[in-house]
């Protein structure tokens, strides 16, 4: 089964001694600890098909190739924001045999001849922005990863309670597994409501 994969990353608060001290004694920015949760979502099933927890200093582009290796299914498109517009990310997508739907950064230059990214850069230079390219190639589906991250935070609390990093990784995978079970039971159906009378 081929699927489209969308990527996102967002912070999870680690609730431990540092948070308790902030609550008890007032704000002190040094004590707060965050972890970044990087996820990949299948746009047809809304299932989180890959996840990785990293330190707050790690960028999404550094984690992306490992996250892509976790997926065992055939993928035809990979969407992500401009942070994934790196050579390593595009190389990982090409190895997987997928098309990259990653907007180039503003003022991006062309890469080597016949690179798939050059089409996107050409659209940006021709139209002055990425708007036309985003509409043409369905970049809006990337919002499904934002929705999945929202579900993680709303349904499962969006914070980690364990202090050990390895235990936090296990806690995160348990959260993702639970969320995928809930998603498998069914997603709410949404429809647009016209408020005009």
Question: Which residue ranges define each predicted feature?
Answer:
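Helix-centered, glycine/charged polyanion-binding patches within enzymatic domains
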Residues: 82, 87-154, 162
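Polybasic low-complexity intrinsically disordered regions
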Residues: 1-99, 104-106, 110-112, 173-176, ...
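Alpha-helical structural elements
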Residues: 10, 15, 20, 29, ...
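Basic, amphipathic alpha-helical segments enriched in Lys/Arg and hydrophobic/aromatic residues
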Residues: 130-197
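Intrinsically disordered and other compositionally biased segments
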Residues: 25, 61, 122-124, 185
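Intrinsic disorder/low-complexity detector
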Residues: 44, 87, 117-120, 168, ...
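Detector for Asparagine
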Residues: 8, 66, 118, 130, ...
């Amino acid at each position: 089964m081929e699927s489209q994969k969308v990527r996102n990353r967002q912070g999870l608060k680690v609730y431990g001694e540092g948070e308790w001290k902030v609550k008890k004694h007032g704000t002190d920015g040094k004590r707060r600890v965050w972890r970044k949760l990087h996820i990949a979502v299948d746009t047809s099933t809304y299932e989180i098909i890959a996840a990785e927890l990293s330190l707050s200093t790690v960028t999404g582009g550094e984690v992306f190739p490992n996250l892509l290796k976790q997926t065992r299914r055939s993928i035809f498109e990979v969407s992500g924001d401009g942070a994934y517009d790196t050579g390593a990310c595009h190389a990982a997508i090409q190895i997987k045999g997928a098309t990259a739907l990653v907007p180039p950064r503003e003022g991006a230059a062309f890469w080597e001849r016949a690179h798939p990214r050059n089409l996107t850069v050409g659209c940006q230079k021709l139209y002055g922005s990425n708007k036309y390219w985003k509409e043409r190639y369905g970049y809006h589906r990337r919002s499904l990863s934002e929705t999945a991250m929202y579900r993680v935070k709303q349904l499962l609390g969006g914070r980690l309670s364990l202090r050990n990093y390895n235990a936090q990784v296990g806690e995160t995978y348990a959260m993702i597994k639970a969320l995928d079970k809930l998603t498998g039971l069914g997603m709410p159906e949404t429809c647009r409501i016209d408020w005009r009378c």
